[in-house]
């Protein structure tokens, strides 16, 4: 009987030690939720974390981006040729335009010969004019010019995606993708979930144990509408989504980080497209700094008084920028956790 008691005691001690170790491990783990509307740059931030804080992507993973970049090329040129009168392209391109207008961009292999044909279409004067004047109305992917300018390289038989290709390529996030990495003995779990409206109902499944929410908004989206609902302005959608999240009682003890993203696009766009046309109460004209301040204040105005929040102006495709910003974010998150929980 004494032996049984001794055995049970050892087993109990082992269980207690396991539970203690698990608790200590959880204390050194920070779960971050990456939220925002579709095309806000969330997934690019997640990919940057892979490059900055891990060994990046394996050769097998890099290979999967070939097909994604190919589909980016084909879907981009397809949107353009579907929206330009065929007669403006000239008789030598008419048949090619009709063909690429009808294909499935996710199924057609991008061969070198097809790449040359797409390059000719892209450089056509009518296509270039349409791109420069109507890209917002057409909801063109931001990767359009990047991939079409380099279609010869991307369609090469020996093409291997570069780090910039991986960061810039457009792939819609569905469901959940988790990126894990360690910084100074702290394990971070970054949860990226789809931002389109039909994906948002799934978000609540990932709310448990979230220490901080990183919310991405695309600054340059103020003149664009949602792909999934062309009656809704993208910036207005982001503001509503932010309001719903930041005022959710579930997150009363959660810190928030606001990424005012795609700063590079906004810097150029505000010089040409008046912000006041979409937000009548804006009074800063074409001034970049005043535009940033206005949008930041729009988001901050709905934040509860007790909520811990910091904002950063970011360009998700700029690795140096994201490295510096995330280092500051990491420190702020840890300080917020200590303040809220200890």
Swiss-Prot record:
Among SUPFAM superfamilies, the record links this protein to: P-loop containing nucleoside triphosphate hydrolases (SSF52540), Transducin (alpha subunit), insertion domain (SSF47895)
Keywords of the record, alphabetical order, are: GTP-binding, Lipoprotein, Magnesium, Metal-binding, Myristate, Nucleotide-binding, Palmitate, Transducer
- In this chain, the stretch annotated as G2 motif covers 165-173
Spell out the molecular function terms from Gene Ontology.
G protein-coupled receptor binding; G-protein beta/gamma-subunit complex binding; GTP binding; GTPase activity; metal ion binding
Query: According to the Swiss-Prot or TrEMBL entry, at which residues is a lipid covalently attached (N-myristoyl glycine)?
Result: 2
Q: Which InterPro entries does the UniProt record give?
A: Gprotein_alpha_su, GproteinA_insert, P-loop_NTPase
Chain spans, region G1 motif: 31-44
Asked whether the keyword Lipoprotein is assigned, the reply is yes
Residues recorded as binding GTP, renumbered to this chain, are 36-43, 167-173, 192-196, 261-264, 316
Q: Where is this region: G4 motif?
A: 257-264
Which SMART domains does this chain map to? G_alpha
- Its signal peptide is none
Annotated segments matching region G5 motif: 314-319
Question: Which Gene Ontology terms of cellular component type are present?
Answer: cytoplasm; heterotrimeric G-protein complex; plasma membrane
What residue spans carry the region label G3 motif?
A: 188-197
GO biological process per UniProt: adenylate cyclase-inhibiting G protein-coupled receptor signaling pathway; adenylate cyclase-modulating G protein-coupled receptor signaling pathway; negative regulation of adenylate cyclase-activating G protein-coupled receptor signaling pathway; negative regulation of asexual reproduction; negative regulation of cell growth; negative regulation of cGMP-mediated signaling; negative regulation of developmental process; negative regulation of G protein-coupled receptor signaling pathway
Q: Does the keyword Chloroplast apply?
A: no
Lipid conjugation (S-palmitoyl cysteine) is at: 3
Which positions are annotated as binding Mg(2+)? Answer: 43, 173
Family affiliation: Belongs to the G-alpha family.
Which function does this protein serve?
Guanine nucleotide-binding proteins (G proteins) are involved as modulators or transducers in various transmembrane signaling systems. G alpha-9 antagonizes broad chemotactic response. It functions rapidly following receptor stimulation to negatively regulate PI3K/PTEN, adenylyl cyclase, and guanylyl cyclase pathways.
Q: Subunit notes for this chain?
A: G proteins are composed of 3 units; alpha, beta and gamma. The alpha chain contains the guanine nucleotide binding site.
Q: What is this protein called?
A: Guanine nucleotide-binding protein alpha-9 subunit
Q: Which organism is it from?
A: Dictyostelium discoideum
What would be the name of the gene that encodes this protein?
gpaI
């Amino acid at each position: 009987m004494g032996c049984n008691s001794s055995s049970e005691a050892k087993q109990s001690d082992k269980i207690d030690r396991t539970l203690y170790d698990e608790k200590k491990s959880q204390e050194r783990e920070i779960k971050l939720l990456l939220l925002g509307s579709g095309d806000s740059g969330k997934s690019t931030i997640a990919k940057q974390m892979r490059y900055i804080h891990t060994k990046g992507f394996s050769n097998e993973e890099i290979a999967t981006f070939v097909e994604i970049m190919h589909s980016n090329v084909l879907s981009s040129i397809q949107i353009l040729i579907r929206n330009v009168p065929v007669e403006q392209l000239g008789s030598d391109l008419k048949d090619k335009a009709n063909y690429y207008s009808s294909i499935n961009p996710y199924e057609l292999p991008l061969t070198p010969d097809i790449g040359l044909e797409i390059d000719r279409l892209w450089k056509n004067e009518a296509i270039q004019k349409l791109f420069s004047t109507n890209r917002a109305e057409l909801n063109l992917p931001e990767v359009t010019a990047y991939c079409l300018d380099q279609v010869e390289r991307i369609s090469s038989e020996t093409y291997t995606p570069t780090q910039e290709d991986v960061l810039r390529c457009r792939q819609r996030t569905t469901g959940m993708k988790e990126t894990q990495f360690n910084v100074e003995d702290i394990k971070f779990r970054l949860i990226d979930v789809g931002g389109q409206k039909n994906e948002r109902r799934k978000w609540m499944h990932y709310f448990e144990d979230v220490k901080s929410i990183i919310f991405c908004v695309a600054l340059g989206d103020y003149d664009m509408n949602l792909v999934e609902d062309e009656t809704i302005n993208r910036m207005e959608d982001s503001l509503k989504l932010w309001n719903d999240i930041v005022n959710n009682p579930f997150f009363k003890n959660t810190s928030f980080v606001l990424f005012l993203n795609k700063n590079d696009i906004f810097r150029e766009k505000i010089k040409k497209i008046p912000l006041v046309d979409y937000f009548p109460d804006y009074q800063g004209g074409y001034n970049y700094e005043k535009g940033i301040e206005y949008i930041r204040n729009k988001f901050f105005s709905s934040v509860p008084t007790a909520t811990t929040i910091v904002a950063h102006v970011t360009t998700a495709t700029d690795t140096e920028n994201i490295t510096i910003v995330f280092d500051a974010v990491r420190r702020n998150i840890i300080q917020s956790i200590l303040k809220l929980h200890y």
